[in-house]
């Protein structure tokens, strides 16, 4: 399956469910308490992150999709912290604030990236929460996917009303289920239980075949569009009536913390489906996203640049010959990772040792090296009849095979000013013995605060000399 990055900016999603605040106390631990055999943590940092349904909405917004959230909180500082964090992330949130009801807070005491203790602050909701009929109908307008983020905390008690309201508008409903009764999700487009939650409903599955059989039966019993079972280190299994099971292996290189991994799965699914992706593609993207987020500490979101880079790595397109649109996206991702972009250009007709040394020196000026190559017509204008010896496709293929080179692109003009104006590299590098002001494009790069560097050429290394030697012999 070929993966590509969806247009998340045109994919509005509404999340309804249990919101909570994930609070972290970070500090050092160097002694045992004299009062009891427990470590003493000297707290030096307090960190708040949106959790539960709020983390789902945050993940959707981090991918660049418009995200709205409906939830229940208390009237306290934890609710204020949640609202401020979500507003800063661009999430439109509507909270039903209940007096004398604490906002759900999960407090984790951390030392040296290890969780020592978790303390939960929560009480059952005394009222009938989320009786927000008018608000839900209003927020459903223009929405392409509805997510029910159910943590079993009591905020969601009207699942069927929400599912039917969305279905009446033709809006897919995705649910992250909890509890021992999945019938409350009847008619949903997709539910995403983990293996433990799934087996709570259908019983233990001794093998994959039994999982598939029981999953297909559950689909029919509950009139579900699809079922995605997340299986930890065994990946994910997507089941649909009348379709073969789709098994995807886990993508995590190293599992550091699984907190919020389920939120990442359903948020990526929702954003991808809202962007028009088919379900198998959306599941593959969610699987890739989950593999990234479990390598982070605590409740965390995956950004669009992180997902795009993972897709490029998966498709083998993280490096190599790119078109302008692909190159600009790759540059955006690199800058999101604080990488310095270096640019150089030339004909590179017959690649020789001098070129290789020069390109290695150029790459050393930053983190990513772009090599812009004159196309065949411009080389002929610059070098005269009989040149180039090698076509532009072959020249770019050879350059792309060098370890020092990240991206290769061609340009039709004699000089690269037009390309420089669009790429805006941090460093422009040229080989030769002339001054910086003589470098073509130096004025453009210096104009936006970039750097221009001139590197010396390797002696007795020249494509022209090689061509003349071949002709004489």
UniProtKB/Swiss-Prot annotation:
Annotated residues that bind ATP are located at 194-197
Catalysed reactions, semicolon-separated: D-glycero-beta-D-manno-heptose 7-phosphate + ATP = D-glycero-beta-D-manno-heptose 1,7-bisphosphate + ADP + H(+); D-glycero-beta-D-manno-heptose 1-phosphate + ATP + H(+) = ADP-D-glycero-beta-D-manno-heptose + diphosphate
SUPFAM superfamilies, per database record: Nucleotidylyl transferase, Ribokinase-like
Name the Gene Ontology biological process terms. Answer: ADP-L-glycero-beta-D-manno-heptose biosynthetic process
Cite the residue spans of the region called Ribokinase: 1-318
Q: What does UniProt list as catalytic? A: 263
Q: Which GO terms describe its molecular function?
A: ATP binding; heptose 7-phosphate kinase activity; heptose-1-phosphate adenylyltransferase activity; phosphotransferase activity, alcohol group as acceptor
Q: In which pathway does it act?
A: Nucleotide-sugar biosynthesis; ADP-L-glycero-beta-D-manno-heptose biosynthesis; ADP-L-glycero-beta-D-manno-heptose from D-glycero-beta-D-manno-heptose 7-phosphate: step 1/4; Nucleotide-sugar biosynthesis; ADP-L-glycero-beta-D-manno-heptose biosynthesis; ADP-L-glycero-beta-D-manno-heptose from D-glycero-beta-D-manno-heptose 7-phosphate: step 3/4
The protein's UniProt keywords, in alphabetical order, are: ATP-binding, Carbohydrate metabolism, Kinase, Multifunctional enzyme, Nucleotide-binding, Nucleotidyltransferase, Transferase
The cross-references to Gene3D superfamilies, in alphabetical order and at most eight, read: 3.40.1190.20, HUPs (3.40.50.620)
- Tell me which GO cellular component terms the UniProt record holds: cytosol
The record's EC number reads 2.7.1.167, 2.7.7.70
In residue numbers, the region (Cytidylyltransferase) covers 343-473
Function summary = Catalyzes the ADP transfer from ATP to D-glycero-beta-D-manno-heptose 1-phosphate, yielding ADP-D-glycero-beta-D-manno-heptose.
Q: Which HAMAP family match?
A: HldE (MF_01603)
What family does this belong to?
In the N-terminal section; belongs to the carbohydrate kinase PfkB family.
Complex formation: Homodimer.
Protein name as annotated: Bifunctional protein HldE
Q: Which organism is it from?
A: Pseudomonas putida (strain ATCC 47054 / DSM 6125 / CFBP 8728 / NCIMB 11950 / KT2440)
